[in-house]
Regions:
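Acidic, low-complexity Ser/Thr/Gly/Pro-rich repeat segments typical of extracellular/periplasmic
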Residues: 2-257, 284
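Conserved beta-strand and immediately adjacent loop positions that scaffold enzyme active sites
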Residues: 89, 126, 193, 269, ...
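A short, structured loop/turn motif at beta-sheet edges
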Residues: 132-133, 148, 221-226, 277, ...
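Short peripheral tails and domain-boundary helices/loops at the edges of structured domains
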Residues: 151-153, 163, 259-267, 412-424
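Exported/periplasmic cell-wall-interacting domains
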Residues: 172, 303, 321-424
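Structured segments of extracytoplasmic/periplasmic soluble domains
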Residues: 179, 183, 314-318, 382-386, ...
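Short, glycine/acidic-rich beta->alpha junctions
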Residues: 214, 254-255, 262-265, 374-379
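Gly/Pro-biased beta-strand-loop elements
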Residues: 243-361
């Protein structure tokens, strides 16, 4: 047992006895769950006649969050600070016993966690070290993190069809979408947590299509070579009415060459521009037009939507069927179920540009399709090989317009209209 030095004793003339006073180690607590103990110590008292005194051994550890704290933010982090002592080891564990990582500074006086905490969990911090007297020192503390009413998981997407991370390069018309799996009550709070950085600097803004979807686009088409980086720091943040972010999102991409195709409904021709230069004029056949009401009361039309479409995805072969929009009777003259080659999807409602070798006489002369842009074999191969997701296919001269929510249809809106969709 380690015993502190004895106090000096007084020698009295004529008295042959000496009184020795022994100091005794004592224990104290820091809150209900922060326990202090010097290993090897005992308790007791010493003193002279008429009273007793207790001496506490030096050194202790201070905890942040405080012992027994509740509703702790998962972003606050955990700090252990040594006072009149040094830290040797720190164990921060969740209820499953998993260790949370942290760093101890060089002088062994401060330890800080380096991982985010989990929601609604009780954590235990166990610290061991040595006090300034060279004695072992141990303390523990417990705290509980906030338990949200509900959580929402955000997704960083290039479109309805694909996550942004699936590609590293996109065309000049690429936008950035954040999807939430729960409706966000406080859109402004969520939008403040979003950041887009571009190199070179590019003006852009966010537009809320719904409480579950917000989209960023630049004021003008992105310049080739631009790097776009986006982050959404939602984890640990209240997005309204106790709905907290379940995770952060981040991603980036680089803008490829400028590739823009402009299809004219009147001339039945499509001009293709690469980096601002017209490189090809392609005979096409667009949607034949007309509207009909289906048995369920819904209405469909066979126009190609006017406006700037963004290429969403490509496939060497795609099954296309009229059943996708309700025409299921094989006897119906508008029924079809075919395997189509060299397809590039440009809207959620089934618009593509693709090879169409069955109506070549109509290319450049008449609109006969069900809404797609029909192209001959040689030109469709070139378009398929040349155009990539994020490239622009603009349609002009039809009586129906693309919806902002149809694919990446936000380019249909003016910049002033787009800015009105911001929550800030």
């Amino acid at each position: 047992m380690n015993v502190p030095p004895r106090r000096p004793y007084a020698r009295l003339v004529g008295v042959a006895a000496a009184v020795l006073a022994l100091t005794v180690a004592s224990a104290c607590s820091q809150g209900a769950s922060a326990q202090w103990r010097a290993a090897g110590s005992t308790s007791g008292s010493s003193g002279e006649a008429g009273g007793a005194t207790t001496k506490k051994l030096p050194g202790e550890f201070k905890f942040t969050p405080a012992p027994d704290a509740t509703g702790v933010s998962v972003l606050d982090g955990v700090t252990v600070t040594a006072q009149d002592a040094t830290i040797e080891t720190v164990s921060l564990t969740n209820p499953e016993g998993r260790q949370i990582k942290g760093d101890l500074d060089a002088d062994k006086h401060t330890w800080k966690s380096t991982e985010e905490l989990g929601y609604g969990k009780e954590y235990t911090v166990a610290v061991s070290g040595t006090n300034s007297g060279g004695q072992p020192l141990q303390q523990t503390s417990k705290f509980t993190t906030i338990k949200p009413r509900n959580l929402t998981l955000p997704y960083l997407r290039a479109s309805d069809l694909h996550l942004l991370k699936e590609r590293s390069t996109y065309g000049v018309g690429q936008t950035v979408q954040i999807w939430f799996d729960e409706a966000v009550p406080d859109k402004a709070a969520a939008q403040k947590l979003l950041e887009v950085k571009t190199d070179p600097p590019t003006e852009g803004g966010w537009y809320w299509h719904s409480a579950k979807k917000v989209e960023w686009r630049s004021k003008e088409y992105l310049k080739p070579g631009t790097t776009v980086s986006v982050t959404g720091n939602f984890y640990g943040k209240d997005l309204g009415n106790g709905l907290y972010g379940q995770a952060d999102v981040s991603g980036s991409f680089k803008v490829d060459r400028s590739r823009i195709a402009i299809a004219d409904n009147t001339t039945h021709m499509m001009d293709v521009f690469i980096d601002g230069q017209k490189v090809r004029t392609i005979p096409v056949s667009l949607g034949k037009g007309g509207e009909r009401t289906l048995p369920d009361g819904s209405k469909i039309n066979y126009w190609t939507n006017s406006g700037a479409h963004v290429v969403l995805e490509k496939a060497p072969v795609t099954r296309m069927t009229s059943a996708s929009y309700g025409v299921t009777d094989p006897k119906d003259p508008n029924f079809y179920d075919e395997q189509i080659k060299l397809t590039a999807k440009i809207s959620n409602t089934g618009e593509y540009f693709h090879e169409a070798d069955w109506n070549i006489p109509a290319h450049g002369h008449a609109n006969t399709s069900h809404g797609c842009i029909n192209i001959g074999p040689a030109n469709s191969r070139w378009m398929y090989d040349t155009f990539q997701p994020g490239d622009i296919v603009e349609v002009r001269g039809t009586p129906v317009r693309l919806s902002p929510t149809n694919g990446n249809g936000g380019w249909i809106l003016s910049w002033d209209q787009w800015l009105k969709g911001s929550a800030l």
